[in-house]
Amino acid sequence: MNDKYATILVVDDEPEMCWILENIIRKSGFNGMTALNASEAIALTENNNFRMAFLDSKLPDIDGLELARQLRKRNAHLPIVIVSAYFYQDDLTIEDALKTGLITAFVNKPFNHDEIVSAIIRYASR
């Protein structure tokens, strides 16, 4: 189901985190494209059709949930996974974002490799 041209967006202000996620994505059979802030991410959506997105919740320009809102306007069906150490799974903000469909899933930092692979298989391999 995954083709070598399918690309997953990673947005995190920590270059190391982008590198880690991009490597997991590549080893899962997809291409990864990274952005260090929301502005870069929005610019990347102009010329790319992403299969899914991993977003940090805290970015230097806007927060990850606001970026998710902007991405939703461009692609209502894009699977969006928030990856965060700031929020927890049972945080009301995250629960609301999941309930309303703003985000598709949540992964807490620090994460383990299998959590990311599982999200990729579930949401990008469609």
Q: Across the structure, where does each feature detected by a protein language model lie?
A:
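Short amphipathic alpha-helix used as the core "switch/output" element in two-component signaling
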Residues: 65-76, 96
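Two-component/phosphorelay signaling modules centered on CheY-like receiver
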Residues: 15-33
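Acidic catalytic/metal-coordinating carboxylates
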Residues: 37, 63-66
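Alpha4 helix (beta4-alpha4-beta5 surface) of REC/receiver domains from two-component response regulators
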Residues: 66, 87-105, 114, 118
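Hydrophobic/aromatic residues positioned on beta-strands within the core alpha/beta folds
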Residues: 83-85
